[in-house]
Amino acid sequence: GVQVLTGLPLVGGVGDFDRLTHPRSLMHFLGLTPSEHSSGGSRVQGGITRCGNSHCRRILTEAAWHYRLQPKVSEAIQQRQQGQSKKVQTIAWEAQQRLHKRFKTLSAKKKSVIAATAVARELAGFVWAIACEIKPADKPAAPEIIRTCKGKVYRLDANKKMAQTK
């Protein structure tokens, strides 16, 4: 599954997933779509475009390497899924199964690096599906940020207002 170290940079890098109307929009945003050279009737696809957020693309590519392992719902994943809707859990399980199968199929024919990139592209589609499934009421409120400066403690709330605490 996608843990905090993968999810947090994605949410921070992409921002509001509602502005992306299709999973391909997220794939384009991350630069995970194949380049294309067309002329007349010929169409040749090349490597990924790499246009877009390189940090998020790297994070997803690293996460894609985990799909070479057999899918399972471990205790850690069960704990993370508590409180999630049944539909989100179903999407996550289908993603694990499909991406593992895709990685195995592609790595048998191509280099494993190319397989990981292709799986990262497909993983972006599943991330988009889950992000669209979570409604704003389901999304947790932004946490308070506590800062200290010269012995004083300040609290920054969700509205970005700073207040000194006692």
Task: Enumerate the language-model features and the residues they cover.
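Phosphate-backbone recognition surface of nucleic-acid-processing proteins
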Residues: 4, 9-108, 165
